[in-house]
Amino acid sequence: MCSIGEDDFGDEGATHAMVAESLPTGIVISPGDCNKCGVVSSELYKLNFRVAECRDCFLNHARHKFRASLGAAKVLPRNAEVLLAVDGSAESLVLLDMLHFAQTQNTFRRLHCNARVVYIDDQSVHGGESMNLQALQALGTRYEPLEFYVVELGASACSLQRLGQYSTSLKEPNGLNTKLEKLRSLTARQDYHQQQRKNLLASVAQKLSCSHVFEPSVSGDLAAQLLTSITLGRGGSAALDVALLDDRLAAGVKLLRPLRDLNEQEVRFYVHACQLKPLRESGSSYGQERGQTASLQNLTAAFVGNLQQNYPATVSTVFRTGDKIAANAHMEQASCAQCQSPLDAKLSDTLLANEYSRAVSEAGVGLSKDGDASESLAKQRLEFKDGLCHACRCIQLELGYDTLS
């Protein structure tokens, strides 16, 4: 009989009953024998649930995950045009290094695709230090012959420039900052920031005639994204937010996440093994400097980060749940004009209740006494063909007369 009663499930749920991982993991600097190939190595890598191994065996393991994610599902056609999104994070540099390595192998093991790299400069929106152009140019030199491009977040794809021709002083004015300032909550600003970045990637890919975009999201990022999508009212498209293949981008561009099977520990080890130098620190994305409780996204990321630290096996279970909750799609189903997610065809009771509360609050005492009138107004709002999903409509209400795009 279970000894955990209902009173045992407090604010922390049942996490107190779970046993945290106690395996000694990390980079062992002292020499030792690799348990995979038997070679004496000056540096051993010990991952969770794996034996200590040398640098070459670890790199083979990590790179195999990258190749296997693309090969098993056969989502990348031969000689496809690929755009790699680099933001300077450790994850994006790992993906860049893996892609470059896969393209410089012999003919038999080579990844047959034509890759380009784009760096989205978001420092004007982020409010931090200006982008390290010198470090970015060093990346371009290290990973030749890949072509590097730079574009500013909030600008049009027409402002795309090659890295060698880009100047931080010659930036086009854009209204993204103004729109972000109009949004009251950091949750809405981060959601809108993410959608704008994704739409810009689609525009850049279309301009460069790329059919696929590589995004450097790992398992922890996807677990946080799945939970965030559900809390923001994007549950109908949450499966696509964490899937290997996301086909919602404009102009038929497909978004791929080939690092979804890697975890934070493997990324950290890979950075050390290949001596990569990230251009930005972990946890420095837009809005994260405001603290863990400043937004739903920050709170969810902190929760998943705690899971990753204490119960690493749980994180992959969370994001893989997204593969099982995909909604039934219809060919004739309309999509959101902002995030391209499928629109709900049926009137949701939950959304109706939210709109009912909003209608009563905005109308005041007079209309709140007439329940039928309030319900009718709520239905009119939901049935209004604005081409937006629930989450994007909430952002539009905060922006007022400004358009999302």
From Swiss-Prot:
Keyword Chloroplast set for record: no
Q: Which GO terms describe its cellular component?
A: cytosol
The answer, when asked if Nucleus is one of the entry's keywords, is no
Please give the start and end residues of each transmembrane region: none
Q: Name one GO biological process term.
A: protein urmylation
A matching Pfam family: CTU2
Checking Gene3D superfamilies in the record gives: HUPs
Pathway connected to this protein: tRNA modification; 5-methoxycarbonylmethyl-2-thiouridine-tRNA biosynthesis
Q: Which InterPro entries match?
A: CTU2, Rossmann-like_a/b/a_fold
**Highest rank taxon of the organism:** Eukaryota
Instruction: Indicate where this protein resides in the cell.
Output: Cytoplasm
Listed A to Z, the keywords are:
Cytoplasm, tRNA processing
**Molecular function terms, GO-annotated:** nucleotidyltransferase activity; sulfurtransferase activity; tRNA binding
Q: What does this protein do?
A: Plays a central role in 2-thiolation of mcm(5)S(2)U at tRNA wobble positions of tRNA(Lys), tRNA(Glu) and tRNA(Gln). May act by forming a heterodimer with NCS6/CTU1 that ligates sulfur from thiocarboxylated URM1 onto the uridine of tRNAs at wobble position.
Q: Its family?
A: Belongs to the CTU2/NCS2 family.
Q: What is this protein called?
A: Cytoplasmic tRNA 2-thiolation protein 2
Protein source organism: Drosophila pseudoobscura pseudoobscura (Fruit fly)
